[in-house]
């Protein structure tokens, strides 16, 4: 919709009028005069925005319109942009080329015309040149047009709506006020002169938005902005916030936000009755269209264009109420006021000036016209405000009236009509009458139309009568008219009234005869419907005049045209008159000045002449004035005629108004009657509604009751259905159960038939096996005879070889004694060095002990966690076994008869089967093993010869080497038993390097001190050696002191790192434990096969026993080790104990796998309900079992304490000594006696012992024979078996797993210790027959009396105590081994054990209590059980694992080494405390089986003495006695860092823990010195890996391989020491 400039101007300043008008309001909320506070009407720009802001830019193709050719001419492809200057509020449209040369620059104002057609945009610059732009797409064109509309609105200060039409070429009618339109729209928020976020849109919906234009149902900006649009055309509409949602905002629209809309009219419907119609005579309202008035009449109305007009407008609105919109001021208002000030006495001139100002101040506005009447004195301001609101206040303020004018004030919404003034200088009487008649508040809606139609008439009257009235006309009606149809009818009537006759001008002393006196009191009219309430205004006063005929609309228009022309003529004449008056006034001014300046006198003639001229001029002026007065008279006559016409119009208007009022009153009365009727109908309808509601509530209650009844019935129906379904399911379950029971009965019948058939077949097999048994027994007797003969021959050969070796050994001992004497002489010379060695040793010991304490604490914590996990695992296993037992019992009732028959068949089958297999298998195996023994003895004999030859060679080298070079190694190699493996290995690497460096220095200095050509004496050589060694040692000690400070700082960091490593090792150990558990499961599968092999091996063991008894050789027995649970080493150093004989329960004899399979089948047949009942019973049984196990533990501990002797410890106490509890446990273990059992006892008692190791070939033969000959008995239920003890492997001590074994009660007897023959010992045994009998006179022959045997054990223990007290050595675990147990003693123990096992479940064996030596047959290397890799590879290692089990679980290398006690520290060459002197003392022991004092014994493998390294602390260190010879076998990982079996030697030749399990050869050469480590030589280690060596003084660390290797085994501990002469 196109707005006039006046409307834009008035809208823009509405806020200022409210501020000024607020001064005159009673309830003013504002503080002070808000008009005095300056606020810019334009939007505040951002600070320092002098630089232009580019709103948008696009590439275009520009065209310029050529008026001559009447076509567009292309200007090329350039770019366009819209630029805004925020500081000035100025916006420009720019078109520029690539060089930024501006081609077009246009200022964008609110009136800027920009049209868009698809991709074309057209505009006109300030020079009137038309331009057209082509965009690349319609989207770019639309965006550009949107920003043009924003810039237009922003340039006008966001005071009015602006728009840009797009494709507005439709020929349909434009939308007008009152039309119903359908619109598709999209709305965005305006953000800093740019398009912001989308807040609403209906483009996606199918139905458009419909509303009636002008009803106020939408925001005011839409009511105004939609007008003028055509169907199918689009419009970009920018609405200021004042015309949108204002300060309140709306949902997603913030307050004071300008809106941007893209509107498209999809349809419109014209308002009904919009066509023009004449006013009806019967008083009915009719519509007079405003469009019928020609707009050409008002084209010359002034428009404010500058800041001066702005200021005048604000002044004109002074005193207006804030609720009204101020009228636009005229540009000539200031002129009229200034001219009136110069002519106070000339009323006509003043009126002419006012009329001229009125003609120049006609404006078009949205608001009603206002009359501003200003006095000549500028004191009387008659302001008439006619607005859209109901309250029209006509303020006629005539203040400071020097001429006696009255004050006409209309402040309260009513017109106080002052028709007569005392003096008519200003003719205010008629003006007031006109104000009252035409500007009354009673017809607010009519005033709009009247003022719009009659502004021209008012201006004419004011000009004719000299009135100071300023009437402003509007070319258009306001956009929103709340009166609806009433306003249009009054417009025509008011227009007709305005064309009446004019009142002629009267003299000053007269009064107008036509103007009547004061009007009668007003008549109250019903107010029209308005948006806001207002007091009812008075009715207008009508001037009485003769009636005039009703004129048509065309005549009215003609009269208005004539009036306009007349006003133009009057205006022209008044302008001429004013110009002449100006000339006259200027002349008077010039005449007032003196002609001649100064005090020069003027002559009278000149004065007279001038006076004559002045008189003539005055006369001329008087004549001209008279002429002008005459003209004025004629003009007044014309005005009178016009006034008469005006009166006619007024009369007509009054008639129309009366008829109109009557019609309105009739309508109102009729409406009142209709309202009364409607109210009566309403009461009737309400009564009916109340009755209907009562019925509704009653029916609703009935419906609710029926619903409740329905719900109850529905619930009952559902419950009945559920019961029915349950009964059906129960029936189906019962049917299924019947079918299952029938199937089970059939299965039982089938199984019964199968068992009968199997019984028959078993009987047949038993008969056949009995026959085979007889044959096997016959063959066995023959084999035994032949065997005895071959054994006698072997014994004779062994005795011969032994004697030969003894002779050679005696010679070597003499040589060793000589060497010893020479070494003793040198010891005194090294006393100073000895002190240094002792100091360094103590320092390193303290460091190692500190590290050991931390390590042991971590190990103890890990041990506890592992024990808890293992106990949980064992409990689960035990509970599972108990559940299986309970489930098995449920089936026993149905199988009792069948089981009884099975037991008889199985027992008979077992006896025959065992006897037959043992007789056949063992006979062949023993022959082969004896042959292998002979071969081994011959090879060993050859090796001993070679070793003797090598020792002689090494003795010669001994004499040439300086012995004092040993000191350097001694300084570094300090024994420390308490260190952990990880620390020891790292220190050994460093020590080895340092020793190499030191030895190289010694070698270099010695080589430099001697010349090859010269000869030296022994004294000089020794002195030079001493000097060199002293220098090197002193230098080394100084370097070490410097390094110690650095190392101490590093050690703290290393401790932290070691703790982290320990945690990682724990995790690895946990993983290994998981792997071990998996291996345990695999071992259980192999138990059945091992059980069968065990039967074969037992016979072999008995035969080996007979061989030993016939040889009358006292052998060191190795007790059978029960299957011991692997656990982490305890941190305490364990005391030496004597192993106690324990009951050996073979874990390989069970058939858990088969039984478990059977149990699973049985378990499937049982329902879950039965299992729940059984679980409760199992829990009770577990509690009872736990109580019994605790009681058994207490009983066993008490028994052990009763027999525990007190053992004194070594003088040198280990810093990590064991606690009291551990010492007590160790003391209890000392009383354990190893009892070797003869063959007859084993056969009768069928005691389960650990299976000896068989060779691979023999094992394959045994397995193949068993598979061929042995027929497995039928699978039996677990109730058929006796419950025996089977220890379960784990990391912690746990309860024994109770399993069932098909074995008689005799198999549950006490464990027997079987003396072991090392497979390398046969050759030595033959040599030692005589010597052993002499050296062990305390060993009694086998006797049958149990009491004597017990007394013997006590004596042995006492002897051990005495020996420990004398020599301060720790007793050997084999010191009280007695191979002379009898059958009577074993039978008594068996009976006691059986009785105890029947009453309770025996506790699992602990590591400390259950460690026993394993029986190993000399000629057999492999057995069905799986041993550790260290056991399989070397039978001669002194520090092998003490916990080798029969479960095939590999023991970790760390756990495999035996913990060494801290040896007693002595001087370097103190040979009195050396192992040689200790050996002579231990020879006097009267033990049952003398132990090798130099053997690092183990509990699971046949151990032999290993080679003694010169600096090794495994046996006797250089600084003390042997503390390891009596060490108890343990599972702790504590190792001597210099242990030859656990860590590297100083010179890198000894294998580490991992290497100890890799090859068998490395274990025998553990103490050899690698000569390449110091001087690049080649190692001269022995190659006989299997030949056990005797502990000795090791010189290999300096001189190469050991020259004193002894072929003697561990079974020859009583041989005299070989003393080599130095």
UniProtKB/Swiss-Prot annotation:
Compositional bias of kind Acidic residues: 1050-1093, 1152-1168, 1185-1199, 1222-1260, 1320-1335, 1380-1412
Coiled-coil residue windows: 607-827, 854-961
UniProt cross-references to Gene3D superfamilies, sorted A to Z: 3.10.50.40
Biased composition annotated in UniProt, kind: Basic and acidic residues: 1169-1182, 1261-1271, 1353-1369
Any matching Pfam family: FKBP_C
Main EC class the enzyme belongs to: isomerase
GO CC field: chromatin; nucleolus
Catalytic activities: [protein]-peptidylproline (omega=180) = [protein]-peptidylproline (omega=0)
Domain PPIase FKBP-type: 178-269
PTM-bearing positions, type Omega-N-methylarginine: 314
Regulation acting on activity, per entry: Inhibited by both FK506 and rapamycin.
EC number: 5.2.1.8
Name of the protein in its database record: FK506-binding protein 5
Taxonomy of the source species: Eukaryota, Amoebozoa, Evosea, Eumycetozoa, Dictyostelia
């Amino acid at each position: 919709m196109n707005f006039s400039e006046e409307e834009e101007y008035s809208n823009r300043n509405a806020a200022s009028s409210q501020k000024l008008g607020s001064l005159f309001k009673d309830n003013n909320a504002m503080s002070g005069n808000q008009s005095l506070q300056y606020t810019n009407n334009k939007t505040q720009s951002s600070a320092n925005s002098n630089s232009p802001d580019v709103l948008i830019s696009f590439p275009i193709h520009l065209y310029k319109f050529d008026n001559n050719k009447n076509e567009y001419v292309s200007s090329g492809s350039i770019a366009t942009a819209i630029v805004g200057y925020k500081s000035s509020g100025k916006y420009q449209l720019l078109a520029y080329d690539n060089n930024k040369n501006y081609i077009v620059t246009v200022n964008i104002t609110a009136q800027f015309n920009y049209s868009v057609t698809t991709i074309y945009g057209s505009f006109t610059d300030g020079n009137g040149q038309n331009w057209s732009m082509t965009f690349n797409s319609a989207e770019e064109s639309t965006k550009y047009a949107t920003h043009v509309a924003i810039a237009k609105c922003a340039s006008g200060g966001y005071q009015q709506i602006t728009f840009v039409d797009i494709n507005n070429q439709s020929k349909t009618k434009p939308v007008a006020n009152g039309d119903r339109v359908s619109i598709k729209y999209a709305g965005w928020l305006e953000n800093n002169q740019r398009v912001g976020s989308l807040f609403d849109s209906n483009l996606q919906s199918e139905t458009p938005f419909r509303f009636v234009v002008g009803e106020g149902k939408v925001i005011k900006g839409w009511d105004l902005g939609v007008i003028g649009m055509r169907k199918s055309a689009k419009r970009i509409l920018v609405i200021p916030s004042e015309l949108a949602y204002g300060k309140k905002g709306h949902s997603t629209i913030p307050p004071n936000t300008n809106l941007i809309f893209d509107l498209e009219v999809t349809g419109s419907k014209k308002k009904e009755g919009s066509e023009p119609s004449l006013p009806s005579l019967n008083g009915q309202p009719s519509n007079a269209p405003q469009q019928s008035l020609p707009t050409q009449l008002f084209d010359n109305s002034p428009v404010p264009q500058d800041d001066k007009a702005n200021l005048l407008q604000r002044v004109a609105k002074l005193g207006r109420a804030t609720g009204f919109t101020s009228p636009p001021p005229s540009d000539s208002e200031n002129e009229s006021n200034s001219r009136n000030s110069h002519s106070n006495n000339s009323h006509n001139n003043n009126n002419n000036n006012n009329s001229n100002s009125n003609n120049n101040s006609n404006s078009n506005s949205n608001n009603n016209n206002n009359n501003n009447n200003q006095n000549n004195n500028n004191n009387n301001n008659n302001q008439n405000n006619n607005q859209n609101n109901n309250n029209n206040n006509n303020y006629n303020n005539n203040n400071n009236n020097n001429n006696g004018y009255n004050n006409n004030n209309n402040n309260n919404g009513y017109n106080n009509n002052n028709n007569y003034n005392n003096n008519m200088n200003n003719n205010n009487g008629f003006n007031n009458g006109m104000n009252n008649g035409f500007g009354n508040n009673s017809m607010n809606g009519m005033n709009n139309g009247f003022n719009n139609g009659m502004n021209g008439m008012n201006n004419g009257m004011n000009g004719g009568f000299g009135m100071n009235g300023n009437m402003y006309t509007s070319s258009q009606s306001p956009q929103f008219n709340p009166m609806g149809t009433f306003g249009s009818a009054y417009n025509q009537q008011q227009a007709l009234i305005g064309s009446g006759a004019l009142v002629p001008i009267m003299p000053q002393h007269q009064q107008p005869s036509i103007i009547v006196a004061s009007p009668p009191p007003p008549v109250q009219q019903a107010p029209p419907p308005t948006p806001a309430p207002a007091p009812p205004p008075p009715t207008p006063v009508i001037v009485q005049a003769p009636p005039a005929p009703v004129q048509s609309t065309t005549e009215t228009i003609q009269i208005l045209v004539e009036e306009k022309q007349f006003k133009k003529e009057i205006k022209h004449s008044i302008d001429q008159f004013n110009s002449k008056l100006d000339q006259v006034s200027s002349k008077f001014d010039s005449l007032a000045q003196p002609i001649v300046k100064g005090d020069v006198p003027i002559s009278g003639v000149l004065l007279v002449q001038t006076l004559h001229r002045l008189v003539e001029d005055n006369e001329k002026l008087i004549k001209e004035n008279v002429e002008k007065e005459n003209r004025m008279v004629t003009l007044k006559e014309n005005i009178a005629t016009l006034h008469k016409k005006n009166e006619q119009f007024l009369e007509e208007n009054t008639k129309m108004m009366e008829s109109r009022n009557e019609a309105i009153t009739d309508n109102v009365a009729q409406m009142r009657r209709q309202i009364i009727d409607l109210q009566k109908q309403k009461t009737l309808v309400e009564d009916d509604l109340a009755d209907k509601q009562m019925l509704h509530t009653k029916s609703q209650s009935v419906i609710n009751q029926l619903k409740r009844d329905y719900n109850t019935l529905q619930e009952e129906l559902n419950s009945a259905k559920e019961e029915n379904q349950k009964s059906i399911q129960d029936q189906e379950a019962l049917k299924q159960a019947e079918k299952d029971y029938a199937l089970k009965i059939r299965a039982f019948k089938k199984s019964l038939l199968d068992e009968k058939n199997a019984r028959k077949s078993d009987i047949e097999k038993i008969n056949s096996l009995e026959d085979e048994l007889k044959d096997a027994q016959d063959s066995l007797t023959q084999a035994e005879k032949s065997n005895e003969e071959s054994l006698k021959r072997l014994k004779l050969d062994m005795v011969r070889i032994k004697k030969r070796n003894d002779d050679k050994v005696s010679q070597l001992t003499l040589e060793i004694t000589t060497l010893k004497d020479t070494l003793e002489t040198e010891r005194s010379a090294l006393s100073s060095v000895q002190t240094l060695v002792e100091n360094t040793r103590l320092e390193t010991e303290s460091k190692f002990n500190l590290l050991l304490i931390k390590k042991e604490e971590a190990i103890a914590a890990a041990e506890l966690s592992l024990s808890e996990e293992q106990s949980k695992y064992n409990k689960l296993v035990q509970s599972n076994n108990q559940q299986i037992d309970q489930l098995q019992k449920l089936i026993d009732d149905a199988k009792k008869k069948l089981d009884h028959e099975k037991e008889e068949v199985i027992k008979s089958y077992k006896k025959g089967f065992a006897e037959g297999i043992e007789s056949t298998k063992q006979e062949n195996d023993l022959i082969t093993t004896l042959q292998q023994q002979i071969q081994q003895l011959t090879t060993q004999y050859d090796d001993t010869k070679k070793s003797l030859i090598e020792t002689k060679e090494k003795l010669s080298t001994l004499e040439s080497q300086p012995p004092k070079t040993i000191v350097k190694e001694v300084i570094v190699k300090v024994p420390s038993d308490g260190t952990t493996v990880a620390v020891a290995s790292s220190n050994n690497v460093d020590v080895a390097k340092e020793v190499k460096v030191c030895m190289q220095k010694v070698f270099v200095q010695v080589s430099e001190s001697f010349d090859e050509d010269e000869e030296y004496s022994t004294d000089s050589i020794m002195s030079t050696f001493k000097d060199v060694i002293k220098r090197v040692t002193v230098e080394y000690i100084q370097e070490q002191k410097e390094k110690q400070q650095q190392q101490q700082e590093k050690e703290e960091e290393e401790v932290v790192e070691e703790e982290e490593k320990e945690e990682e090792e724990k995790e690895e150990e946990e993983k290994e434990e998981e792997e071990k558990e998996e291996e345990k499961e695999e071992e259980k599968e192999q138990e059945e096969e091992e059980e069968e092999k065990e039967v074969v091996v037992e016979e072999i063991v008995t035969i080996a026993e007979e061989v030993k008894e016939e040889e009358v050789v006292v052998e060191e027995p190795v007790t059978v080790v029960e299957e011991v649970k692997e656990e982490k080493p305890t941190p305490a150093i364990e005391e030496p104990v004597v192993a106690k004989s324990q009951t050996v329960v073979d874990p390989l004899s069970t058939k858990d796998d088969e039984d478990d399979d059977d149990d699973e089948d049985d378990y499937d047949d049982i329902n879950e309900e039965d299992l729940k009942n059984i679980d409760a019973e199992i829990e009770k049984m577990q509690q009872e079992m736990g109580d019994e196990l605790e009681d058994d533990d207490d009983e066993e501990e008490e028994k052990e304490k009763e027999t525990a002797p007190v053992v004194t410890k070594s003088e040198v106490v280990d810093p990590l000594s064991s606690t009291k509890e551990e010492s007590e446990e160790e003391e209890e273990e000392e009383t354990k006696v190893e009892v070797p059992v003869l063959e007859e006892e084993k056969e009768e008692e069928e005691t389960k012992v650990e299976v000896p190791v068989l060779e691979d070939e023999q094992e394959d033969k045994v397995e193949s024979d068993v598979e061929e000959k042995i027929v497995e008995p039928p699978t039996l239920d677990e109730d058929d078996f006796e419950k025996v003890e089977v220890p379960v492997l784990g990391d912690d001590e746990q309860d024994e797993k109770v399993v069932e074994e098909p074995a008689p009660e005799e198999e549950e007897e006490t464990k027997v210790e079987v003396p072991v023959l090392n497979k390398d010992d046969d050759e030595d045994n033959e040599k030692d027959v005589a010597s052993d009998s002499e050296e062990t006179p305390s060993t009694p022959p086998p006797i049958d009396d149990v009491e004597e045997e017990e007394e013997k054990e006590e004596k042995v223990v006492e002897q051990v105590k005495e020996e420990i007290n004398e020599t301060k050595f720790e007793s050997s675990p084999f010191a009280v081994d007695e191979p002379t147990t009898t059958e009577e003693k074993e039978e008594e123990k068996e009976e006691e054990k059986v009785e105890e096992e029947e009453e309770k479940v025996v506790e699992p064996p602990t590591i400390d209590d259950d460690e026993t030596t394993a029986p190993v047959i000399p000629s057999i290397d492999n057995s069905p059980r799986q041993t550790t890799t260290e056991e399989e590879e070397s039978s001669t290692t002194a520090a092998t694992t003490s916990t080798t089990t029969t479960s095939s679980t590999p023991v970790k290398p760390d756990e495999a080494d035996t913990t060494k006690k801290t040896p007693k520290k002595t001087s370097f060459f103190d040979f009195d405390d050396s192992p040689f002197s200790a050996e002579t003392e231990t020879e006097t022991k009267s033990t049952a089986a003398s132990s090798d004092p130099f053997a690092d014994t183990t509990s699971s493998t046949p151990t032999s003495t290993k080679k003694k390294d010169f600096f090794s602390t495994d046996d006797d260190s250089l600084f003390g006695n042997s503390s390891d010879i009596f060490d108890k076998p343990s599972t702790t990982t504590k190792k001597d860092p210099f242990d030859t079996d656990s860590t590297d030697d100083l010179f890198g030749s000894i294998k580490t823990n991992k290497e100890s399990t890799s090859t068998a050869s490395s274990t025998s050469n553990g103490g050899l010195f690698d000569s390449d480590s110091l001087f690049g030589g080649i190692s001269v280690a022995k190659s006989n890996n299997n030949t056990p060596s005797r502990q000795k003084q090791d010189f290999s660390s300096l001189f190469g391989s050991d020259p004193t290797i002894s072929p003697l085994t561990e079974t020859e501990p009583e041989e005299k020491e070989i003393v080599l002469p130095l």
